[in-house]
UniProtKB/Swiss-Prot annotation:
Protein name: Peptidoglycan-recognition protein SD
Signal peptide segment: 1-18
Function field: Peptidoglycan-recognition protein that plays a key role in innate immunity by binding to peptidoglycans (PGN) of Gram-positive bacteria and activating the Toll pathway. Has no activity against on Gram-negative bacteria and fungi. Shows some partial redundancy with PRPGP-SA in Gram-positive bacteria recognition. May act by activating the proteolytic cleavage of Spatzle and the subsequent activation of Toll pathway. Recognizes S.aureus PGN.
GO cellular component: extracellular region; extracellular space
UniProt key word Nucleus: no
Length: 186
């Protein structure tokens, strides 16, 4: 490799350092929305942490299957136009793209407006997500501020604070209360 090739490789590494890789809708084979989705103006004032309350996943194939299953359930049984969350975090430490942050979510009833929905795939009532998943979520929150999806002083909330639910599970809820931007109030 020439010095120019090394320079290009080095600059590319610098450009992507600190960016959370996101598994796109095309990569997990999402269906298109089946109806209109209201838009929201970004940056948003809140990030809401949830869990899907179902099975967990630890590899790319299983996590993508969980994404398709959740989307199918939310579109057919819950009658959402698309998957309800903006981002989901797998046990493989990867972030999965849900709906656009500029589209109103479908996870917190009247509190969807102004909220970025981030759900961990699995049930975290008794056990917290693994370190890889937790680190991915923290990096995603930082990246969302840098990309003007969240305001710099956003409020971090648990799903149970904005909706009548046990989500994000007791173990995960206890952890996120220690994260930057945690807020007791909406």
């Amino acid at each position: 490799m020439t010095w120019i090739g090394l320079l290009i490789v080095g600059l590319t590494a610098i450009a992507v350092q600190g960016e959370v890789p996101i598994v796109t809708r095309a990569e997990w084979n999402a269906k298109p929305p089946n109806g209109a989705i209201d838009s929201m103006e970004t940056p948003l004032p809140r990030a809401v942490i949830a869990h899907t309350a179902g099975g967990a996943c630890a590899d790319d194939v299983t996590c993508s299957q969980h994404m398709r299953n959740l989307q199918n359930f939310q579109m057919s049984k819950q009658k959402f136009s698309d998957i309800g969350y903006h981002y989901l975090i797998g046990g493989n430490g990867k972030v999965y793209e849900g709906r656009s942050p500029s589209q109103r979510g479908a996870f917190a009833g009247p509190n969807n407006d102004g909220s970025l929905g981030i759900a961990f795939i699995g049930n975290f009532e008794k056990q917290a997500p693994n370190k890889e998943a937790l680190d991915a979520a923290k990096e995603l929150l930082e990246q969302a501020v840098k990309q003007a999806q969240l305001v710099e002083g956003y409020k971090l909330l648990g799903h149970r604070q904005v909706s009548a639910t046990m989500s994000p599970g007791e173990a995960l809820y206890a952890l996120i209360q220690q994260w930057p931007n945690w807020s007791e109030e909406m």
